[in-house]
Amino acid sequence: MIRAWSHYSRLVRLHVIDGTYELFRAHYSPRPDHRAPAGWDAKATVGVVSSMLALLHDAAEAVTHVAIAFDNPIRSFRNDLFDGYKSDEGVPPELHAQFDAVEAAMHALGLVVWSMREYEADDALGTGARRYADEVDQVRILTPDKDLAQCLRGDRVVQVDRRQKKTTDEATFRATRGFAPESVPDFLALTGDTADGIPGLRGFGDKSASLLLGAYVHLEAIPEHAFRWSVKPRGALQLAATLSAHREDALLYRKLATLVDSVPLAESLEDLRFTGVPRGPFEAWCDSLGVTALRTAPRRWRDP
């Protein structure tokens, strides 16, 4: 059960945010188009700034420490492991052109930015969740991406889907999914993850994978033959044959889905403390993008 949080101002909460998701969401949202005075499409960048201001103003979220991570570019070491893994291919050029711009906008807001190249934004989020969890009351991972569920830890590390207004802790995840957060990479190896280009194994769906991992936790522990299984998903004989024939593929897919939790992040927890929006840089950013209405939007300014 999610802990009932009260006296927000007394809590130390670290929000780690999937900036790439925020950028894509803003680009494809119905919000009005916006072009910077220089002529480039700035809709997504302005959208992310508006989204972050809403978060910073949300009394229920009560942000005290914050970092936002971006894939820049959308390519990592995983592309060297598997040709089909997600990449920049197919990203609209007007969106791709905003990858650097949105990071600059986040700096203007006073947020710590984790710009990932060799690793992915998700790896930075996972690293932050592991590294700082024991120093704060709660780490809140802001993304709907299902692979981040592997980071859940009691109600100390939770996942927040702002769009659905849903917060998931470890107990909720176990109750609804039927397996442990540590099994998430194994689950994605079996079922696939279209967003990341992981194909999964033919025939495995949510129900069969959940049953098996609820019983065995990891791929290596699943017996080779179905008659030895303690659970009986539909089509067990064929599933066992598929897993036996494609076990190496499954192990590769699991490696792709396993977050790196040792990304070299330079910041201490104190570096992540949100102390307000720096007025000069933010107002200059607003002027450069022609969004003067946002100049007075922040409710908390950083002391000079």
Language model region names:
Residues 1-2:
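Short hydrophobic transmembrane-like helices used for membrane targeting/insertion
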Residues 9-142, 146-166, 250-252, 258-266, ...:
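Noncatalytic, basic helical substrate-engagement surface that gates or grips nucleic-acid strands
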Residues 60-64, 164-304:
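Non-catalytic nucleic-acid-binding/docking modules located in mid-to-C-terminal regions
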